[in-house]
């Protein structure tokens, strides 16, 4: 966690994923079919990353991502790259409202550890090499809590004598991975996390085992904070609390109230929170989430990335003003509610509409914070 003056998250910021161009989707299909080589696919990938980085810089973003073009899933590709984690067919779609996903999943195949050859390191090095001076290369990875979910840790007893021993290894693997990103020159990392929205749904369900999910929340705080402990002081680490994002559909609904006490304990420099519609509830929980940490920024995701219609600037400004009853304006920032393509399928809007959404975020933020 940084100890210097707030920089990132910026007053206007990008969550991470961008719509995959047709050329990249085709290249992925050809690679899977064996009709092009990995080097040929990588050349197309780099060309498209260079293009979207230039577009982000042109828009005026102070931190840019590679659009997550080097991965198919926002979370699984990273998890598969850790030592002790393997890929398998779950034979079930993730339960999005109104659509079905591919059935890939991750599972423990050994003790979890940092992998010095994780493919995300090479992807970051390419991004870093093309980002101009004065702009940060932002790296997104899934939260360690994503290994708790969807049967991914079911066989932990094969490799560990206790659940706590597993959590300790998981935290260390993440800590070492984040440290290596920093050693490669990364100063801005974001941990994306749907677990909190999952817990919102469970803790609001009168038939759910609340004691079990409360323990889950406590473990999540423990692992995340252990992963963040003793990292360099000039490294910014944020999180994005996601409710699911697949072809413009979602997984979870509910206000942040039931998880706010836990979110307030997390030692992040900033939290990106989805607030694009009534499913997210109101701003009442912001006071607990921010937890009166003058160093921390709450990034309000008031602009949807799921649909092309542009929000009205006046409405966005009114909502930011409403949030100041819980968090000072100096500790707030603005973004889209999520990325545009958490999986390579992408949301139901065009690339031009995607850039228009980001331009709206930037323009509105500059009106709210003239110094932005």
Residues of each region from the PLM?
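Domain-level signal for soluble alpha/beta catalytic cores
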Residues: 1-372
């Amino acid at each position: 966690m940084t100890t210097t003056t707030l920089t990132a998250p910026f007053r206007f910021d990008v969550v991470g994923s961008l719509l995959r161009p047709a050329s990249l989707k085709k290249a992925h299909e050809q690679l899977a079919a064996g009709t092009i080589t990995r080097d040929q696919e990588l050349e197309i990938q780099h060309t498209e990353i260079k293009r979207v980085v230039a577009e982000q810089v042109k828009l005026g973003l102070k931190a840019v991502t590679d659009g997550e073009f080097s991965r198919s899933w926002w979370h699984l590709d990273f998890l598969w790259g850790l030592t002790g984690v393997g890929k398998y067919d779950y034979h079930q779609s993730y339960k999005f409202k109104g659509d079905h996903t591919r059935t890939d999943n991750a599972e423990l195949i050994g003790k979890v550890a940092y992998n010095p050859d994780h493919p995300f390191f090479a992807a970051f090095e390419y991004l870093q090499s093309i980002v101009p001076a004065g702009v940060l290369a932002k790296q997104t990875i899934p939260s360690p809590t994503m290994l708790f979910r969807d049967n991914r840790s079911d066989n932990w007893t094969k490799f560990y004598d206790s659940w706590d021993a597993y959590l300790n290894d998981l935290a260390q693997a993440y800590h070492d991975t984040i440290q290596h990103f920093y050693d490669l020159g990364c100063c801005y990392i974001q941990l994306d996390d749907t677990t909190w929205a999952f817990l919102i749904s469970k803790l609001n369900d009168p038939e759910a085992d609340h004691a079990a999910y409360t323990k889950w929340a406590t473990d999540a705080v423990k692992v995340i904070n252990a992963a963040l402990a003793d990292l360099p002081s000039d490294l910014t680490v944020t999180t994005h609390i996601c409710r699911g994002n697949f072809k413009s559909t979602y997984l979870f609904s509910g206000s942040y109230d039931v998880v706010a006490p836990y979110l307030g304990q997390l030692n992040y420099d900033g939290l990106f929170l989805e607030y694009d519609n009534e499913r997210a509830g109101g701003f009442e929980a912001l006071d607990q989430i921010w937890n009166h940490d003058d160093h921390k920024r709450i990034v309000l995701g008031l602009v949807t990335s799921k649909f092309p219609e542009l929000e009205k600037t006046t409405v966005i400004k009114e909502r930011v003003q409403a949030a100041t009853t819980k968090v000072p304006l100096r500790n707030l920032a603005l973004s889209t509610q999520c990325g545009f393509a958490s999986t390579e399928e992408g949301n139901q809007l065009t690339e031009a509409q995607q850039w228009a959404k980001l331009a709206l975020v930037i323009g509105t933020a500059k009106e709210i914070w003239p110094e932005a």
